Amino acid sequence: MSEFNFISRLHNRGLISHITNEDNLSKLIENKSISLYCGFDPTEESLHIGHLLPLIMLKRFQIAGHRPIILIGGATSLIGDPSFKEKERVFNSNYNVNIWTEKITKQISCFLDFNCGKNSAVLLNNNTWFKQINILSFLRDVGKYFSVNTMINRAAVKQRITRPDQGISFTEFSYNLLQAYDFFILNQQYQADLQIGGADQWGNISSGMHLIHRKTKRVVYGLTVPLLIQSNGIKFGKTESGTIWLDSNKTSPYKFYQFWMNIEDANVYYFLKLFTFIKVSEINKLEKNKNIKNQIINDKSLLAKHITQLVHGKEKLLAAERITKFLFLKNTTHIEESDLQQLKQDGIPFIEVSNVKDLQEALVLTSLAQSRTQAKNMIISNSISINTEKIRKNHIFHEKDKLFGKFTLLSRGKKQHSLLCW
């Protein structure tokens, strides 16, 4: 297989976990434009960074001339995918799913081009066909093609079945058939020959390929991207303070940017290959120089810039960079009121104040100091700053200390900060 074909380039970036009939799929997509799809169940009001790889994969295919189909699981989200889940999901209401569908649709729409000719992206909702099918038709037309023996041995659900304290309901057990039917419908009506997803979706994707082959004798394909696990065993995108969301109202662009700045050094160049469109040859050159002073930090910044702009746009990237310079480089020149609102949202601890008189009191209130005595000693030792300016004696707050009349940044050393909100 040529090292220059599309599938080989995906391998070269470490983007493929599973793939079926690789040679045939590679020939197919080199010879014609295909349609492919990826599904997203609206089980929350926002997608998170665990969804980024499939979204970016769709974008890569579109850039290569193929038509991406995004399937919103308006129906399947009412059931919930049990794959590798330790316990049964809590059912979501129709009301919530409808609201979440609207929000997630807007998020996803920013990633792809919906007006570029034959390979314009398509956005669908599987509620369109599931609301039209009755249970008897589904069991006859779909269920008869699946062996329960095979289904219970799938790794995605086997751990639940073998746990007497949990088990799995018939409702969740049937999810596999619902997703298989999605692939069948998209293949029949939209000529989707490929489904992509996370590695945990391999069982569901395989079921879709099986159903299509049994009903139509057609050969279709599946491809999954890696599931990323951090060194502590936690799924990528989870932090001590919670999930990193794509919605700027749930995770500010600044916090999103900082997440990438704080990834483990060992992952920097791998993530540049996974999440950016920078050429692999250029990334390899950067990696060769990683031991040069500040090179890793610069390359983390490159990663953070690319992904923040992809998800949030240029303006919010610039805001994240301004806030970073404000906190860590003491640069207040271009800081804006909206930047400080981001810090208040989730960037650093904050407290609402009205009548705080002096710095020692404020340090105790913000827990930067445990007592006024400790606060006094920290001030004397030159470790306290107000709005990035060092303070060497106790300070009475004035209007000039309030940025935009609302905010005062207190810092202890380089890494501990708190925001006074007046």
From Swiss-Prot:
InterPro entries, sorted: aa-tRNA-synth_Ic (IPR002305), Rossmann-like_a/b/a_fold (IPR014729), S4_RNA-bd_sf (IPR036986), SYY-like_C (IPR054608), Tyr-tRNA-ligase (IPR002307), Tyr-tRNA-ligase_bac-type (IPR024088), Tyr-tRNA-ligase_bac_1 (IPR024107)
First-level EC class: ligase
Catalyses which reaction(s): tRNA(Tyr) + L-tyrosine + ATP = L-tyrosyl-tRNA(Tyr) + AMP + diphosphate + H(+)
Protein keywords: Aminoacyl-tRNA synthetase, ATP-binding, Cytoplasm, Ligase, Nucleotide-binding, Protein biosynthesis, RNA-binding
Gene Ontology BP terms: tyrosyl-tRNA aminoacylation
Domain of life: Bacteria
Pfam families reported for this sequence: SYY_C-terminal (PF22421), tRNA-synt_1b (PF00579)
UniProt cross-references to SUPFAM superfamilies, sorted A to Z: Alpha-L RNA-binding motif, Nucleotidylyl transferase
Domain S4 RNA-binding, chain residue ranges per copy: 357-414
Gene Ontology annotations for the cellular component aspect, listed alphabetically: cytosol
One GO MF term attached to the UniProt entry: ATP binding
Binding residues for L-tyrosine: Y37, Y175, Q179
Record motif 'KMSKS' region, residues: 235-239
PROSITE patterns on file: S4
Motif residue range(s): 'HIGH' region: 42-51
Positions bound to ATP: K238
Localization per Swiss-Prot or TrEMBL: Cytoplasm
EC numbers, comma separated: 6.1.1.1
Keyword tRNA processing: no
NCBIfam families, per the entry: tyrS (TIGR00234)
Biological role stated in the UniProt entry: Catalyzes the attachment of tyrosine to tRNA(Tyr) in a two-step reaction: tyrosine is first activated by ATP to form Tyr-AMP and then transferred to the acceptor end of tRNA(Tyr).
Stated family: Belongs to the class-I aminoacyl-tRNA synthetase family. TyrS type 1 subfamily.
Subunit structure: Homodimer.
Protein name per UniProt: Tyrosine--tRNA ligase
